[in-house]
Regions:
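Short, basic, alpha-helical segments at the C-terminal edge of helix-turn-helix-like DNA-binding modules
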Residues: 63-70
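C-terminal peripheral helix-coil segments that are non-catalytic and often amphipathic
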Residues: 139, 143-144, 175-217
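Helix-turn-helix
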Residues: 2, 13, 21-56, 60
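Hydrophobic alpha-helical connector segments
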Residues: 60, 74-107, 156-159
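Amphipathic alpha-helical core segments of compact helical bundles
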Residues: 93, 160-164, 168, 187-191
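Short secondary-structure transition hinges
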Residues: 100-146
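A short secondary-structure junction motif
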Residues: 42, 68, 98-106, 141, ...
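Hydrophobic alpha-helical bundle segments that form small-molecule/ligand-binding pockets
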Residues: 73, 129-159, 163, 167-174
């Protein structure tokens, strides 16, 4: 078989097709064969040359979405006209409302059944998002007096673990009501930490996304 001179184009095509099928059918209801059937003649071998499993494809699709999210985080972190508190508020508002969230919850992977993706997301949160995006904002807020807190790195990790995992119905397969209750507790926790920056909008949006997830399972 001739060597593929443009492997990055093949990978991009596979991810484009997989992302579309995950959106249309849901991750759990999309098979490797479904992806092959929509690749315009590419063989199963072409897929397995780049990805060992459907879960590997999901991780790569999610990495694409994460890169968009990180650009948003960097833009807010680097704004010169916002104090630390305002930046943290903006992070929550933009994160929960960005269109990519609807895509993720529509794909509806059960993270408990896909440990590779869950571990990848956990590693990204602890090694990159918390220290490189959230901690600098907390440090700025502490310095400018708009945030009263200690241990900004550990606080950044706690906030992101709660927001990205504990409240995430794709991790614990929670009902709409359970997620609603968790967001209420999260808001109370943030207030207790001196971070009264989340409101009913967060609760309503998390309930909305949970309903999307449950519908597409």
């Amino acid at each position: 078989m001739a060597r593929n001179k443009h492997p990055e184009e093949t990978v991009s095509l596979i991810l484009d097709v997989a992302a579309r099928l995950f959106m249309e059918k849901g991750y759990e209801h999309t098979s490797i064969q479904d992806i092959i059937d929509n690749l315009g003649g590419l063989s199963k071998g072409a897929i397995y040359h780049h990805f060992k499993s459907k879960e590997d494809i999901l991780v790569a699709v999610t990495d694409r979405i994460t890169s968009e999210s990180n650009r948003m985080l960097a833009d807010i972190r680097d704004q010169k006209d916002l104090c630390g508190r305002e930046k943290l508020q903006a992070i929550f508002k933009e994160s929960i409302n960005r269109p990519e969230q609807d895509a993720i919850f529509t794909v509806a992977p059960n993270l408990g059944a896909n440990p590779k993706l869950l571990f990848s997301m956990l590693g990204e949160t602890i090694s990159d998002v918390a220290p490189n995006y959230i901690r600098p904002i907390l440090e700025q807020g502490i310095a400018d007096g708009t945030i009263e807190a200690a241990c900004p790195l550990e606080l950044a990790e706690l906030i992101m673990m709660a927001a990205n995992f504990w409240m995430n119905p794709m991790v614990f397969d929670d009902s709409v009501e359970k997620v609603r209750n968790k967001t209420v507790i999260f808001c109370q926790m943030m207030k207790g930490l001196g971070l009264d920056i989340v409101d009913k909008e967060l609760t309503d949006r998390m309930v909305e996304l949970t309903a999307v997830y449950q519908k597409n399972r």
